[in-house]
């Protein structure tokens, strides 16, 4: 009742209670205006404009634990993502955590979709693995943090070792990502297809490709839900007022992960919407910050 009322703009007063204003999640225009400082280093892992990754590196000698940041935006460039995650990257770097802020080709860019989007994310993470020593990064302490569409990609990236050998996305030595924080994620391309279509106007076929004789199951190498178990711990954080990826989607995915034998938990944040999950000035940030520090075995602040 409370969530529905807030979404409709009502204030509900029950007997014996005091009227309070409903939470107001950050609006899209305000989210798109969010910017963080410039990264310490920028790498181009391909020739396309979106094939870049940014490094926010802490001061000091290192080696530093790493948070791989994969922004969302309905797999479409008009919704931004990279600039907004710069603020989180800079905040993490100030705490001694390196942030690897990944950009990738999206559905409305040449080469985006299946398989290009996945290849971009995988390549960006492979760059981290191959350059970690020179950049003073500790790949034994890694967490992937993805928001919305980026959560789908982060969970997929952590499961790359489970890719069918015949898949064009398969790699010989994928970086182990022991923990993934999914923020308002849409991780199950098969069962979340309707939610993805309603929220993003995207047909999941653009994200999975079409089946053929050599690849009859298009989810086997694109959807993390079909790549379980994968020895990854999942923490699914969702705003109570998230209308794009409602908390029940996270709960269903967590149940599926647990049923497969991997650890997972769901966290619902009161008074937070979908875009609040990706900004510092929100009820989500303190929980996200504490979660990142927890999985990287850093002391609580």
Predicted stretch roles:
Residues 126-194:
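Primarily recognizes the serine-hydrolase "nucleophile elbow" in alpha/beta-hydrolase
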Residues 81-100:
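Short amphipathic alpha-helix adjacent to the substrate-entry channel of hydrolases
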Residues 23-61:
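N-terminal cap/lid segment of alpha/beta-hydrolase-fold proteins
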Residues 112-133:
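Alpha/beta-hydrolase active-site loop
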Residues 27-32, 38, 48, 191-226:
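Mobile cap/lid helix-loop segments that gate and shape the active-site cleft of serine hydrolases
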Residues 272-282:
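Catalytic histidine-centered segment of alpha/beta-hydrolase-like enzymes
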Residues 243-252:
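Conserved alpha/beta-hydrolase "acid-adjacent" motif
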Residues 236-238, 242:
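Short beta-strand/loop motif that positions the catalytic acidic residue
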């Amino acid at each position: 009742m409370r969530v529905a009322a807030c979404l409709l703009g009502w204030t509900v007063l029950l007997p014996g209670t005091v009227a309070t204003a409903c939470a107001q999640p950050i609006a899209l225009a305000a989210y798109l205006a969010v910017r963080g400082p410039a990264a310490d280093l920028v790498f181009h892992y391909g020739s396309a404009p979106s094939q870049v990754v940014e490094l926010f590196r802490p001061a000091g000698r290192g080696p530093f634990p790493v948070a791989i940041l994969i922004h969302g935006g309905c797999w479409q460039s008009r919704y931004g993502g990279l600039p907004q995650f710069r603020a989180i990257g800079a905040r993490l770097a100030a705490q001694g955590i390196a942030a690897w802020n990944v950009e990738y080709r999206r559905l409305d860019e040449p080469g985006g979709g299946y398989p290009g989007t996945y290849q971009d994310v995988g390549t960006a993470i492979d760059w981290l693995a191959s350059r970690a020593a020179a950049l003073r990064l500790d790949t034994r302490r890694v967490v992937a943090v993805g928001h919305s569409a980026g959560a789908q990609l982060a969970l997929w990236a952590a499961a790359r070792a489970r890719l069918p050998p015949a898949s064009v996305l398969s790699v010989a030595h994928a970086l182990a990502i022991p923990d993934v924080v999914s923020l308002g994620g849409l991780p199950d391309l098969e069962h979340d297809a309707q939610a993805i279509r309603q929220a993003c106007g995207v047909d999941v076929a653009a994200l999975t490709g079409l089946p053929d004789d050599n690849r009859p199951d298009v989810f086997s190498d694109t959807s993390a839900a079909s790549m379980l178990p994968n020895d990854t711990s999942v923490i699914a954080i969702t705003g109570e007022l998230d209308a794009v990826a409602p908390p029940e989607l996270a709960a269903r995915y967590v149940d599926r992960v647990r049923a497969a034998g991997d650890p997972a938990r769901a966290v619902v944040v009161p008074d937070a919407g979908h875009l609040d999950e990706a900004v510092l000035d929100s009820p989500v940030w303190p929980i996200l910050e504490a979660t990142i520090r927890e999985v990287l075995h850093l002391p609580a602040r």
